[in-house]
Amino acid sequence: MRIVVATAIALVLAVPLNLAIEAFARQAFAVPPEFEPFQGTVAPYTAGGVVLAGAAFAVLRRVVRDAARVYVRVALGALVLSWIPDVALLVIHDPGATVPGVASLMAMHTLTAAIAVTSLTRIAR
């Protein structure tokens, strides 16, 4: 039950903060409207990522002795992997992809990971 609570807390924090980052990026950096990651997918993708984070923590709690320590490493690896498609948007010259837009997307991933890791490792231990 504590994993569910920790995941819910992470959801309640991460989704609005990522939407705020998106809004800020659109205004401050003039991220083009054709930038696909900002076309209505921020909230559902953030929610999906947080739910997957909670599921991963639940699995680790069942299979390893120190789930929190292992989870931090797994989450860090997942975060680094999540940046690969972000950078790829620039490499493949995706329509609307700009350095500030991609950096904002990477910041969202980082913020979500930090919130999920903190919530899961402190509340769901």
State where each predicted segment sits.
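Canonical alpha-helical transmembrane segments
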Residues: A47-V63
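Internal alpha-helical transmembrane segments of multi-pass membrane proteins
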Residues: I3, A58, R62-V80
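Alpha-helical transmembrane segments of multi-pass integral membrane proteins
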Residues: I9-A10, P44-G49, S104
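Aromatic-anchored segments of alpha-helical transmembrane domains
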Residues: V15-P16, G77-A88
